[in-house]
Structures are given as structure tokens and as C-alpha cells.
């Protein structure tokens, strides 16, 4: 649950940017793998 909250809080303002979105997805995957 905290992970979801973290994603929402740290979500970049320019979601239209595919690069920023992909970077965030990567970060999320890495964090979930580490857990």
C-alpha cells in the first residue's frame, strides 16, 4: 500500500512524457523486486 502511495506522491507532473513515465515504472519495478 505504501508503495502505491509513494508512486502517487512522486508521480511526475508531466505524465505526457513517455520517458518520465517509463523511468517511474522502472523505479517501481526495482523497488518491488527489492522488497
UniProtKB/Swiss-Prot annotation:
Protein's name according to its UniProt entry: Probable protein L3
Organism of provenance: Odocoileus virginianus papillomavirus 1 (DPV)
Top-level taxonomic group: Viruses
Keywords: Late protein
Amino acid at each position: 500500500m505504501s508503495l502505491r502511495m509513494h508512486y502517487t506522491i512522486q508521480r511526475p507532473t508531466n505524465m505526457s512524457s513517455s520517458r518520465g513515465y517509463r523511468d517511474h515504472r522502472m523505479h517501481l519495478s526495482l523497488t518491488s523486486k527489492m522488497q
